[in-house]
């Protein structure tokens, strides 16, 4: 060992001494400091002892160490007079780390404490996304979030996740990742796009503040934000950004075991169900975009377009659950309803486009409005779950309107115009009717929380947030008022019919015919309320005065809050024609055959 010239006289002991019996006191020749040296025999049988005097740069002057040769397997005897040990005390160590510690070699590499992955128990490589985990679970979690993957469990969602079985059930593995503290938002904020054109503009106008969320439509477990430029080149930011995933991370299962988002007890877990409507919407949107751009190179005749639509709706039909649905006959046939009446749509003559409806405008089948929530239910509320639930409600509302014979009698062009004009009102009525099933209050509270954080982070302008907050307040007020009135299924059905057959929208044809249908809906609602709630004289008036509030809600904000997570910059108006072109018999037949 190389060291400066010692300033302390070292006296070695005779190798024949069997035990540490001698204590020598030496004096520093310069300072006069007395140091006690304890000597002992090396148990390795070495003929000569090794006395090592630490350098002044060591742990401290005056430390004397007696150590066995490095090649010896015997224990090392450390003699020291430093402050951390009693002078003259013998400390027996067998590992090099302790020797290095006593020598003051703190910079020498030493064995690290082994940590284990909290998910599978394998050797951890560090803390990733908020939890100590191995490289395998780190990569699995990152892929699941970035690619928006969703999984299903073939068992009871309680599979054992360990080093050897972690790949058997991806659903339970991802679930355990979340339970052990891995954060989805950490994955999203880890990297930023390198494309400058995708960066958020600092001076974004309030009118263009929207969010478009990148989607893996095979299985959208969670939304990943991206900014999509409009046709005019304006980049947009918006309401549901990455922070939405932070502030909306509210457990869907309370501590007492009750579920916030109610689901149908008969519904079974189905793999990929969460993204089914997203696939349909995108198929229709892409087809619409191709047709609007005049790109017919890949879409030859109308037959191919029809087949694209049919395939899309086949997928849609399998996601819906209407056990009581039946194929609707054509308008020329009579329909026997459960109430015993029949509906006949009769045209007086070709020159007079007024149609008379014999029997009730709505049958008992139109009263049933059963929304099936996406399955499997995620443990934490996320943007795609909200958008998927809203999309199912929208499609269910349009299918409900499509099944009314009087509505079909108006013709395809009139149908499209009516639904485009009132889809937001129909959707809002559906929200009020299904508020408990969707846990609407939880969804709105999460959105409000996110908007409050957006104010602090200057992600949205004050005017834009004010508009959205007013819209949410109106929506919540409307739903609360409908719940307070305790509107039943018949009343909701007739209110939707009144909204659907509104003749005052601009650009409508056959306004006289539409007005007659609306009057009939109002009369039938009045008869029902008088018979069912005869003791409540003002009930009908209190119900009808709620309808004007629907016109005060912006369809653009509704679309932005509930649908951009799935369809991006594709408008609802562009999707409506394809939904209404589906043949009712084929549509209902697919639904009946695919009931969950």
Curated annotation (Swiss-Prot):
Q: Which residues form a coiled coil?
A: none
One Gene Ontology cellular component annotation held by this UniProt entry? chromatin
Q: PROSITE patterns recorded for this chain?
A: NR_LBD, NUCLEAR_REC_DBD_1, NUCLEAR_REC_DBD_2
- Tell me which InterPro entries the record gives: NHR-like_dom_sf (IPR035500), NR2C1/2-like_DBD (IPR048245), NR2C1/2-like_LBD (IPR048246), Nucl_hrmn_rcpt_lig-bd (IPR000536), Nuclear_hormone_rcpt_NR2 (IPR050274), Nuclear_hrmn_rcpt (IPR001723), Znf_hrmn_rcpt (IPR001628), Znf_NHR/GATA (IPR013088)
Give the keywords, sorted.
Answer: Acetylation, Activator, Differentiation, DNA-binding, Isopeptide bond, Metal-binding, Nucleus, Phosphoprotein, Receptor, Repressor, Spermatogenesis, Transcription, Transcription regulation, Ubl conjugation, Zinc, Zinc-finger
Q: What is the effect of changing residue 576 to N?
A: Reduces interaction with JAZF1
Q: Where in the cell is it found?
A: Nucleus
Chain positions with Phosphoserine modification:
19, 46, 55, 68, 98, 219
Q: Which family does it belong to?
A: Belongs to the nuclear hormone receptor family. NR2 subfamily.
What does the record note on quaternary structure?
Answer: Homodimer; can bind DNA as homodimer. Heterodimer; binds DNA as a heterodimer with NR2C1 required for chromatin remodeling and for binding to promoter regions such as globin DR1 repeats. Interacts with PCAF; the interaction preferentially occurs on the non-phosphorylated form and induces NR2C2-mediated transactivation activity and does not require the ligand-binding domain. Interacts (MAPK-mediated phosphorylated form) with NRIP1; the interaction promotes repression of NR2C2-mediated activity. Interacts with NR2C2AP; the interaction represses selective NR2C2-mediated transcriptional activity.
Tell me the protein's name.
Nuclear receptor subfamily 2 group C member 2
Tell me which species this is from. Homo sapiens
| Classification lineage | Eukaryota, Metazoa, Chordata, Craniata, Vertebrata
